[in-house]
Amino acid sequence: MLTRTLLSALLSLMATTSLMAQLTIKDLTDGKYRPESENVEAMADGESFSRLEEGKRIVRCSFKDGKTLETLFDADNVRGRVKIKEVCDYIISPKEDNILIETEHQQIYRRSGKGKWYIYSIKNKTLAPLSDGDAQEQPLWSPDGYMVAFVRDGDLFLVKLLFNNSESQITKDGELNKVINGKPDWVYEEEFIFTRAFCFNADATMLCWMRFDESEVPAYSFPLYKGLETERKEFLTYPGTFEYKYPMAGERNSIVTVHSFDIKSRVTRKLSLPVETDGYVPRIMPTSYPEKIVCLTQNRHQDQLSVYVCNPRSTECRLVLTDDVKPYVSETAYEDFRIVSDGFIYKSERSGTAQLYHCSINGGAPRALTSGEWPVVEFYGYNAKEGNIYYSAKDGSPLREAVFVCDSKGKVKKLSQREGVNEAVFSTNCRYFLNKWSNIDTPPVFTLCDGSNGKVLTTLEDNSELRNRLSSIRLGSKEFFTFTTTEGVTLNGWMVKPADFNAGRKYPVVMFQYSGPGAQQVVDSWSAGNMGGCLYEEYLAEEGFICVCVDGRGTGGRGAEFEKQTYQHLGYLEARDQVETALWLARQPYVDSKRIGIWGWSYGGYCTLMSMSEGRPVFAAGVAVAPVTSYRYYDTIYTERFMRTPNENPDGYADNAISRATRLSGRLLICQGTADDNVHYRNVAEYAEALIQADKDFYQIDFTNRNHSISGGNTRAFLFRQITNWFKQM
């Protein structure tokens, strides 16, 4: 009887398991398991936010309960003859009476794009084109809401609403691959992470902008083919060429100057901003004072950030702060730089961990607003009257982040309620915030919360549909772990095991990593893994693999000392740590030590190649997607931040994937887009030649007309099928 009962239970379990859904690569790449998101913009009243619904409606909602208060724009209810079908982006005017609405968006580079923009009157429900000319880039309302400035073809334009939307051209020297006004060049956009390089002053009497003279920057070009998705019929017979300015390590950068335009007198001036030879201007921004804008500068070594207060009318610039941080200033310093009513707030690692500081607009010693062993991740808001500052920081572990408020006396209160990774968008008065929470097992949950105590007021989105979809799949277990290398370094990792894991079996392992400076893959967040939720890793687990990710030396979340020890030798320590991970895994009783593979994308591809040629032959196979192979071929700003120039650091540059080609061990697959504007095809071309001359076998797949993301049409599904099959052949 007992035997019959056990047999019945076993058959029932087998039947249930066989009925459960399976993950497929096509479903993963087509977005079947992509979580819903909430993108909101806080409105001026401090009580409401706006958001875009279904790509055609802009609504105003309450921060208290999330309910819709009014519809600001509906594409189906526009009056007049001008109509649009979709909303790609929108910008509400300062007085919240008009909206700039974008349609027909066209991507330019990773962060930039252009489109057809319209001015929408909320009161009249009418649309009017922002310009009758070609597509516009980066439109910006003036503080009084009566003007809009934008960029087109490298020049700045100004539209005045009070003069029947009259358009005037502010600059006239913009020229492809020579001069850009009001928007960054390629390397500034990519590495300083911004797309608009102009601003109005506080009373809207002056327009200020950055001018990029890239005429002496070396050009780079690559071929464009007809292709299929999207088809370029103009290249049916002969391929075309895309050429742009790309400064590689040690080469010339654009000469950047800052200018002002007096809107009434139409006088243009050049600001007397001191910039070191070949130095940088990562940001300009307005203050609440009409006679003051702020300009940030950096030296070429990027170990000094200077803050200047500039008068756009007199052109005088006064130094108010210099932040010296060795060996380099992290890019988050200017990402989180914020002008507030009584000065500015910035993030610095001067104490060894990233913390927030306040400085008067008139200068003086900066005052620390936060402190502690765990780094601040992001700055959200500041209440000057109460002295409260709102931010996220690591929460007792590099893996987790929480939202905090710190008062004027330094007392810190955690606002977020759940352990994992929390991010926030605060109302303009910081009374409320939208909290995005997830952990490695749970898709994002978006809640509206009280800004004083973090109490959840309502849930906007909990991704219940996705959770239900995933509940029908037999997923493997995900677990965090730490281990210590033979060099005495403790590293963090996560591991995904098959759902039917048997400790008595030996499993092949696929290691995924990125490993770049300041980056993190090992986080208690749904963002973990290559496709979020470790879902691609779960798919591999279904196929019988254990999947592992370890953050080695140089990665983020553990303070400046841990992060910056790879300085001047990118790839050396990172590769050692990935090899150490493989050696540790090989000692585990459930791992097949002869079948350990590694892969990564971009920097992760570089680290894959460096690890497979580190000298200890531990990897049976590897896949490098869009890899850098020598940092001589990568851009100035990123590379020199971590490596200085090739002339200053010849030994650091000399140790690269190409020079290590003779030591390659394991079966290698390289995947590369032919139209990658970021990591150029040249990287794999030069590496392939080195492998051929070293008589090393390898396989390579080129993706026609694909950029660094290698996507479009069936491309992603094909790519991940090749990666999967490659590891199946270990």
Q: PLM features: residue spans?
A:
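Serine-hydrolase catalytic core recognition
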Residues: 290, 423-730
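Blade-loop segments of beta-propeller domains
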Residues: 67-99, 104-106, 132-137, 324-327
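Predominantly five- to eight-bladed beta-propeller fold
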Residues: 69, 104-109, 113-116, 170-198, ...
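Signature of short aromatic-glycine-proline-rich micro-motifs recurring in repeat-based ectodomains
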Residues: 36-40, 84-91, 183-202, 283-284, ...
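Asp-box/WD-like beta-propeller blade repeats and closely related beta-sheet repeat scaffolds
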Residues: 111-157, 163-197
